[in-house]
């Protein structure tokens, strides 16, 4: 019996409201991913693009400090609304948690949060969304790859 060739099928579920996704990643921490992601977002905005930035580093979010954002995002009942600063739409777990509270989450909680940020944030007609990834190859990277970014 001859078997059929294996074909991998992805569930196509891109980040809604965006045209292009740029994920900024590195296996090592402290190499400037967040700084680069922020500067890239600002540069694209200065070129006239509509830009958003998603801080996907659940354990060490830096977007609140880099953008000096000290507020919580609003919700329309089903989706979170990104916070707009410098004409850039922003979302981070750091907007939803207390800075002093340690994030002691396991895989399923991280996966759920990343899916929420990818699918339940009302990104408004963006040309680019910059995803600031955490270091390594863990749950966040796997989750984003499975939702076909």
Features from the language model and the residues they span:
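Phosphate-binding/switch loop-helix module in NTP-utilizing enzymes
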Residues: 97-143
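Extreme N-terminal, non-catalytic leader segments
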Residues: 1-27
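Signal for well-folded cores of large energy- and translation-related assemblies
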Residues: 19, 23, 45, 64-71, ...
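Phosphate-binding loop that captures ATP/GTP phosphates
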Residues: 50-105, 111-113, 118
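Short loop/turn elements that form and flank the Walker-type P-loop nucleotide-binding site
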Residues: 17-19, 47, 84-85, 124-126
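Walker A/P-loop phosphate-binding motif and the immediately C-terminal alpha-helix
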Residues: 20-57
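Conserved small/polar residues in nucleotide/adenosyl-binding loops
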Residues: 147-149
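Short glycine/serine/threonine-rich phosphate/pyrophosphate-binding segments
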Residues: 31-39, 61-62, 136-141
């Amino acid at each position: 019996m001859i078997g059929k060739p294996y074909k991998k099928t992805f569930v196509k579920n891109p980040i809604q409201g965006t045209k292009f996704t740029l994920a900024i990643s590195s296996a090592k921490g402290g190499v400037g991913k967040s700084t680069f992601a922020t500067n890239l977002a600002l540069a694209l905005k200065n070129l006239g693009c509509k830009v958003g930035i998603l801080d996907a580093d659940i354990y060490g979010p830096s977007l609140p400090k880099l953008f000096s954002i000290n507020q919580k995002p609003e919700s329309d009942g089903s989706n979170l609304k990104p916070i707009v600063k410098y004409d850039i739409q922003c979302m981070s777990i750091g907007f939803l948690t207390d800075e002093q509270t340690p994030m002691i989450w396991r895989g399923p909680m991280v996966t759920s949060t990343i899916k929420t940020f990818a699918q339940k944030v009302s990104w408004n007609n963006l040309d680019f969304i910059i995803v600031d990834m955490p270091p390594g190859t863990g749950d966040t990277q796997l989750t984003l790859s499975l939702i076909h970014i």
